[in-house]
């Protein structure tokens, strides 16, 4: 099941902001998301609900 882990990018490395339950050396897939800050206010009510449903169905939330 996908998990959302907040991280900060420093010196070319993503550093999680909380403890992560992974084995040392385990591979993960990182999805970088800055969408909220860049698109705030562009979408209106109905469109936003459809987008949220699509994101949730893809496992990002």
Curated annotation (Swiss-Prot):
One protein family per Pfam: AF2212-like
Keyword line: Toxin-antitoxin system
InterPro entries on file: AF2212-like, AF2212-like_dom_sf
Entry keyword Membrane: no
Function: Possibly the antitoxin component of a type II toxin-antitoxin (TA) system. Its cognate toxin is VapC13 (Potential).
Recorded family membership: Belongs to the UPF0165 family.
Record's protein name: Putative antitoxin VapB13
Lineage: Archaea, Methanobacteriati, Methanobacteriota, Archaeoglobi, Archaeoglobales
